[in-house]
């Protein structure tokens, strides 16, 4: 209807020419040359056909918004004198208030384009007022409320300042928050145009800290007041991830006037950092030059210059352009709808057509989101806002969400008092907040601002329990320390002198039977000299040290001796204890090992040591050392071949461990005396029993110059590490002796000279491997590493163990190797048993198969189970006999082997035919053959068919059979068949046979004997039974024959078997078909 009416009005042409005067009231000193924008808007409307001959606009421009409200007078003059029937503006809120109220009385429309006051949204007062400005107080309040609800906040505080402008804004925010269910928990009011220092000194920030975590800032001066307030917040330490600051941006200038830009446009990072962790709500193009470029291009494309325009008021120009378009479009729509050319005089009607209208604005074609103008239900522009997050320590502003209006249906804004739209929040970014998980802060602490929401009873009780536990732990520690001291004082390792007795050498040899046993070591004399018995039956070896003064053990000594007493490992010799402060001697006792020391083994030439012994001994020593190095004891300290004992299981047990350091200290204190055996110039390997040879060089050098030159003094202070590296050196010496049965020095070397060379740092004399052909090169390198002069370069005991096990192919101790050999033997034995068992099973299978060929399967199974098979009478079975015709003649002209070969060949074929047709061969006697079916397994009536099929196949086989040694002679047989009752059973125990008995057998035999060559003779009973159940067989009457013992009997010839097609043809013939 509207379209047709519009076309009709256009056709009127010259008949209806309406020219409306529109008055624009600008502002003195703002938006120069605003009439240029209005003229551009009018030209665009004319191009679009909105304005034309029937409807045109005349624009009158006047200035207002001065100090004396001259804009109000200008408005009255325009209406009464100049005939203006619509207003655009005034620019400022105060004058727009007066002009809009008069326009309501005059019933003419007013389009505001810069005023932002919330009061203009009341359409009960401003009935003909529409606004196209992007930012208004009430829309910003709606945007702030939508953002707050979107992030789940329900409690906020408002920060504002004194003054009418701020009061009006706060009132608008409070009303919207109340409508949206947002509770304003606190409102602070600052002095207008105050500074950051004054804000901090006012104490108001502390009030915010104690009442809110989400704060909305609604100041009269958006730029200046927010700048000072956020500086105060930052200096007060409240600008962090626990607070959210929401800044609704009412500034209408471009981003050149952002608060962190100076007067000359310079960027101020320190000011911007004050705005960190805040949300700035602005139109969707805020903090951007998005509108500037398309605005200039649009004006220049229309032939206008932008040089005389104020680009900082770009929003004002855009709104002014959109205001004229809104009015013209509304008038055109009104005229089209009413058909009355004077309808533009009805301001209320024109205002109604400004509601819910959407049209392109000045920059809508440039892809700018805010370029399109959408009016709500009370002719207010529905804005498109965005929330911008200001990240800390960054020069950018991040858009995190957009708030787009969505119009509501079934809503009348004139009744509800609002624009009938909702702001829909769309997230553009998440996880941006500088918290641990990126989540925004809650609107209040979990326990409230005064901890009123948390029950601390559990926490207090828990704290008391924790405190009690700590006290108990302290008490337990003190008590355990006391108990430990008591336990140390109890000295479980102490052995009183009266509790053991030493054994003389002769007595020991008698006890161990050394003299009579050839398997014992002959060099155990030194070992058995130090033997004792503790208690009644515990044999021990001991070391005796003369004691000069009483020994008082310190805590470290007591701990070490307790640890030695508690040490348990397969390759450690148990420490039995010590006897001290008695009889002026100190005795250290260890468990006795019956096979002596490894030194006795090495230097006994009667004993042969192969690689298995080498690997097992070295492995045991490394395992023992590895345990000591990883235990609390920490080291051995005096490793020598005679401190490696061999138990009765040929396992190495390390002895004398851990005691070297205390002995050295006690000797320096003058408490005991340690005796060192010096063998002088004795060069035999077995006599060089001196521990000094196994001491590393750093332990023997006693000159300060040598110590400082050869090693770092700080390392020497580390006693445990020093002792461990000394163990590695000593292990290298012992391993060389095990492998080569000699010390790692040239033959003929004097022991005393060796020790002197080692002590003297000016001469180089080190152990070396002289015969390197017998062992792996890597093992040689390992030995040399163990003897390295620098202790820090020597390998760890773990590396030594892994390398020796790898190079010597060690797989356990000697007992382990013997067990593996026994296990291998057992596995071989099991394999042999399995093979023999398999052979036995295979023989059993062959025997079972052979037995199954001699006897029926059922009978064979019963006999194998040891059960007897009773004779049984079968009511109906069929027996067949066969006989080779002329067999005697053939045998007379053949050798026995040829006869056997012939019979084996023909009977093998017969056996296959018998098995094929479910028959059983009872026996063969020479050339005679007895076959039965239905015995021993009954098969109903099938026995006659099985025998007939078998007989026919035997005849067929003989037609193609040739005697191997007589190709020209044809083999012929006679067959006889009879059906009847048969008795069967097993006869004999040694060679059991399954035999058939009864008249049926005799008759079958007579049928064979009276038959003719190459023919199958059947008795009357067999023929009748076959014809009754199986008519496919071709049987013809022979006549009467004389059977021995039976007299004359009637017999038949079995000629063959009809095929299925012949059977069908015969049946059809009988039916007459």
From Swiss-Prot:
EC nos: 4.6.1.2
Segments traversing the membrane: 459-479
Domain of life: Eukaryota
Positions annotated with a glycan in the UniProt record: 336
InterPro entries, alphabetized: A/G_cyclase, A/G_cyclase_CS, ANF_lig-bd_rcpt, Cyclic_nucleotide_synthase, Kinase-like_dom_sf, Nucleotide_cyclase, Peripla_BP_I, Prot_kinase_dom
UniProt feature coiled coil, ranges: 813-844
Protein name: Receptor-type guanylate cyclase gcy-23
Compartments (UniProt record): Cell membrane; Cell projection, Cilium
Function statement: Guanylate cyclase involved in the production of the second messenger cGMP. Regulates thermotaxis responses in AFD sensory neurons. May regulate AFD neuronal activity such as calcium responses to temperature gradients.
SMART domains, sorted: CYCc
Limits of the Protein kinase domain: 508-808
A biological process term (GO) from this entry: thermosensory behavior
Extracellular side: 16-458
Xref: Gene3D superfamilies: 3.40.50.2300, Nucleotide cyclase, Transferase(Phosphotransferase) domain 1
Membrane topology: Single-pass type I membrane protein
Similarity comment text for this entry: Belongs to the adenylyl cyclase class-4/guanylyl cyclase family.
Keywords assigned by UniProt, alphabetized: Cell membrane, Cell projection, cGMP biosynthesis, Coiled coil, Glycoprotein, GTP-binding, Lyase, Magnesium, Membrane, Metal-binding, Nucleotide-binding, Receptor, Signal, Transmembrane, Transmembrane helix
A single cellular component GO annotation: cilium
Ranges where the Guanylate cyclase domain occurs: 878-1008
Annotated organism of origin: Caenorhabditis elegans
Signal peptide: 1-15
Organs and tissues of expression: Expressed specifically in AFD sensory neurons.
